[in-house]
């Protein structure tokens, strides 16, 4: 069984045991988060009805906090000698999907 969930504005394809990284949310260390389900596939049966998906649940356990890849920003103006260099690393939370429930 696998599901498509909405996490941090993106759609992720997950199954039990998969590890996903999303933008920081309000969760304690070792805490759980429930992700909204957009599509559920159980063998040959596909569930896409919004009323049934409201009952479905994907639980994920918080593993660790990381920092994403470095993004370098460089501003430059021609003929003036102006340039500015800056970097940024976005915080990322890593979760492990522990269960997918249909909720019927």
UniProtKB/Swiss-Prot annotation:
What InterPro entries is this protein classified in? bL21-like, bL21-like_sf, Ribosomal_bL21
**Which superkingdom?**
Bacteria
One Pfam family cited in the UniProt record for this chain: Ribosomal_L21p
What Gene Ontology cellular component terms go with this record? cytoplasm; ribonucleoprotein complex; ribosome
Name its GO BP terms in alphabetical order. Answer: translation
Q: Which UniProt keywords apply?
A: Ribonucleoprotein, Ribosomal protein, RNA-binding, rRNA-binding
Q: Which GO terms describe its molecular function?
A: rRNA binding; structural constituent of ribosome
The entry's function note states:
This protein binds to 23S rRNA in the presence of protein L20.
Similarity section: Belongs to the bacterial ribosomal protein bL21 family.
Which HAMAP family does the record associate with it?
A: Ribosomal_bL21 (MF_01363)
- Provide the assembly information: Part of the 50S ribosomal subunit. Contacts protein L20.
Output this protein's name.
Large ribosomal subunit protein bL21
